[in-house]
Design a protein with these regions (language model features):
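FNR/FR-type flavoprotein reductase catalytic core
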Residues: 4-5, 78-172
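Ferredoxin-reductase
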Residues: 2-90, 148-150
C-alpha cells in the first residue's frame, strides 16, 4: 500500500445492479471516467460520503478490468442504507486499496482452487475468482461451493450461472 491510498479520490457511481433484495453492486469510476486505482485480488477500499459516514468494502471486480471497480454491498447500516438509496451519477469518495490481497501470482499458480462462501461472503472472493478466470491457463481446477438462505439471496447468481459455470474446469 502506498501513501496515495490514504488520500480520498472523488468517484462517480455509474451503474447500480440489484443482486438480491438487500444486496446491490455499485460500479464506480473516477471523475475522468477511468478506473480510480489499481488493486490486487482480495483488496478493499473505503467508500464515504461527507455527512453520512464511511465504510470499508471488498472490491469485487477483477484487477484485470481496466475500466471500473465494483463493490457488492449488503444493506445493513447507516452508510449502506444511504448507498442503497442513491442513483447512478452520485459522487462518492473512495480511498484505497487496502489489504495485502491474495497471493494469486505466487502461491496459487498451477494449483487447484477451492472457494467456499455464503451470502455476501462471496464478495471478497469474487475478485479472486474472476482474476483466475481471466488467467485461466495459469491455474488448475476451480471448485466453488456457495450457498445462501434461498435462491433469491444468491449474490451474483447471474454471473455464476452464465459465466462461471461455462468455464472449463470450473465447478459451481
Amino acid at each position: 500500500m502506498t501513501n496515495d491510498a490514504l488520500f480520498p479520490k472523488v468517484g462517480v457511481i455509474t451503474d447500480i445492479r440489484k443482486d438480491t433484495p438487500d444486496v446491490k453492486t455499485f460500479r464506480v469510476v473516477g471523475l475522468d471516467g477511468k478506473k480510480m486505482f489499481e488493486h490486487k485480488p482480495g483488496q478493499c477500499a473505503m467508500l464515504s460520503m461527507p455527512g453520512v459516514g464511511e465504510a470499508l468494502f471488498s472490491i469485487t471486480s477483477s484487477p484485470t478490468n481496466e475500466k471500473f471497480m465494483e463493490f457488492s454491498i449488503k444493506k445493513c447500516g447507516c452508510v449502506t442504507d444511504w448507498l442503497h438509496s442513491v442513483e447512478p451519477g452520485q459522487k462518492i469518495t473512495v480511498r484505497g486499496p487496502y489489504g495485502n490481497g491474495f497471493p494469486v501470482d505466487t502461491d496459487f499458480k498451477g494449483k487447484n482452487m477451492l472457494f467456499i462462501g455464503g451470502g455476501i461472503g462471496l464478495a471478497p472472493l469474487r475478485s479472486v475468482i474472476n482474476y483466475i478466470r481471466d488467467h485461466r491457463a495459469d491455474y488448475g481446477t476451480v471448485d466453488i461451493i456457495y450457498g445462501s438462505r434461498s435462491k433469491d439471496d444468491l449474490v451474483d447468481f447471474k454471473e455464476i450461472e452464465e459465466e462461471w459455470k461455462n468455464e472449463p474446469n470450473f465447478n459451481v
